[in-house]
């Protein structure tokens, strides 16, 4: 089958890889000059299934009001003047109760755990290297309340069979030795030993090269004007003076998917702006061994080979990509506070990107009402974490194979009022 994939970020490229491996003739179209040039370029570097959780959580509405008056707030909202933004925020608020949070986090963890397993299989099969580490993730708590609140997330981890360790502050240095110098600032941490890290852009570029060698065609510097449709199917992609035709079409345009699908499929994917710093390492012993997540500021600090990646923040501001100095100062503040000897901050590269977020935090993967149009978008801050699993899942569904995990509650159909998902089965249980 001829398949056109729109988008060459990590989600688009993994989709191309798995569809190609399934025997399809795949073409990837992107306006950029190469893969992973936008949202996948400089994310936090975490592959953290256990921390897969929606921003829509109990208490967030009140916290958002408080954050409005804080200098280093993890979330900021600025109206962009569109009704869509207001509708999206209202849908997000409706998911900020315990029932929705547990349901959304459960399916996010399900897909993310599967994705991590798919990445392991891919790595073993291809030998792909991307400055990856398999050292786990450590979520750091600065208050006693945060430590106590971890029990809510632990319940989801146990239900999904995700191994974990709840550590007191005195034990954090066993996992991240450099934290011994700042343990007095912390109350404890939640460690997920099976989590991984890696350079998402490097992975995407190298996998794209492998995919091309396997027969995938990449059409870079090719802006897409619109999808052409009639009745219940898509019949082409209009690019300037050319119409590119295929048997099936996959939308993986990230935050730009919503506009491209206007009038065709209504999906609630909105850009969530994030920032990162990439810092050269000065003292390896003063840098993280793997990756940490600061629960207070929602900022991740990740070790690559010779660099530290500091990523976080969430701005609901539309498609604005201005680099704002106050957010750089927040990233600098957190990394100085936790790893003061780790990197040369003055030489850091400052970056921003737009993560495609749904109101419930779960991506949109699967079929649409158009028989040859498929979606793989809306992964929010977890595109790197969920990319391989989403790509394999999409390939299985499109190819008529039975996927390894339940998937009906990942489709756009879940936003219908009459939607009733099949309850996923518990896979296993293990923790320490």
Curated annotation (Swiss-Prot):
Its cofactor is FAD. The keyword Oxidoreductase applies. It comes from the Bacteria. GO terms for cellular component: cytoplasm; plasma membrane. It comes from Salmonella paratyphi C (strain RKS4594). Keywords: FAD, Flavoprotein, Oxidoreductase. GO terms for biological process: D-alanine catabolic process. FAD binds at residues 3-17. SUPFAM superfamilies: FAD-linked reductases, C-terminal domain, FAD/NAD(P)-binding domain. This is D-amino acid dehydrogenase. GO terms for molecular function: D-amino-acid dehydrogenase activity. Pathway: Amino-acid degradation; D-alanine degradation; NH(3) and pyruvate from D-alanine: step 1/1. Belongs to the DadA oxidoreductase family. Oxidative deamination of D-amino acids. It catalyses: a D-alpha-amino acid + A + H2O = a 2-oxocarboxylate + AH2 + NH4(+). The keyword Metal-binding does not apply. Signal peptide: none annotated. The gene is dadA. Its EC number is 1.4.99.-. It is an enzyme of class 1 (oxidoreductase).
């Amino acid at each position: 089958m001829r398949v056109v994939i729109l988008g060459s970020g990590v989600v688009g490229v993994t989709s191309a890889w798995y569809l190609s491996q399934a025997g399809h003739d795949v073409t990837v179209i992107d306006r950029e000059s190469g893969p992973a040039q936008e949202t996948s370029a400089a994310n936090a570097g975490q592959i953290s299934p256990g921390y897969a959780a929606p921003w829509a959580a109990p208490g967030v509405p009140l916290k958002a009001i408080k954050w409005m008056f804080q200098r280093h707030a993890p979330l900021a909202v600025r109206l962009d003047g569109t009704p869509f933004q207001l509708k999206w925020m209202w849908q997000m608020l409706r998911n900020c109760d315990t029932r929705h949070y547990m349901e959304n986090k459960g399916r996010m963890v399900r897909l993310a755990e599967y994705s991590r397993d798919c990445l392991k299989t891919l790595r073993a099969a291809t030998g792909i290297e991307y400055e990856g580490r398999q050292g786990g993730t450590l979520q750091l708590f600065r208050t006693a309340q945060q430590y106590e609140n971890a029990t809510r997330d632990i319940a989801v981890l146990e239900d999904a069979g995700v191994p974990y360790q709840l550590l007191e502050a005195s034990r954090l240095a066993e996992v991240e030795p450099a934290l011994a110098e700042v343990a007095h600032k912390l109350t404890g941490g939640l460690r997920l030993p099976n989590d991984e890290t890696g350079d998402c852009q490097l992975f995407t570029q190298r996998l794209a090269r492998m995919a091309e060698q396997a027969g995938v065609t990449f059409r870079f510097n090719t802006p897409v004007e619109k999808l052409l449709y009639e009745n219940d199917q898509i019949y082409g992609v209009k690019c300037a003076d050319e119409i590119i035709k295929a048997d099936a079409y996959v939308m993986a345009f990230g935050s730009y998917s919503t506009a491209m699908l206007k009038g065709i499929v209504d999906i609630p994917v909105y850009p969530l702006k994030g920032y990162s710093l990439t810092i050269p390492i000065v003292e390896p012993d003063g840098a993280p061994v793997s990756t940490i997540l600061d629960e207070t500021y929602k900022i991740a600090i990740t070790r690559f080979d010779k660099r530290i990646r500091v990523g976080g923040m969430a701005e609901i501001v539309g498609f604005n990509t201005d680099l704002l100095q106050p957010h750089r100062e927040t990233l600098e503040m957190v990394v100085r506070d936790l790893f003061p000897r780790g990197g040369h901050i003055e030489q850091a590269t400052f970056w921003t990107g737009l993560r495609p977020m749904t109101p419930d935090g779960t991506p949109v993967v699967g079929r649409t009402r158009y028989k040859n149009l498929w979606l793989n978008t809306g992964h929010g801050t977890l595109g790197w974490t969920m990319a391989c699993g989403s790509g394999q899942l999409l390939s299985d569904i499109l190819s008529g194979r039975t996927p390894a995990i339940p998937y009906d509650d990942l489709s756009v159909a879940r936003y219908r009022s009459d939607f009733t998902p099949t309850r996923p089965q518990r896979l296993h249980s293990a923790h320490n």
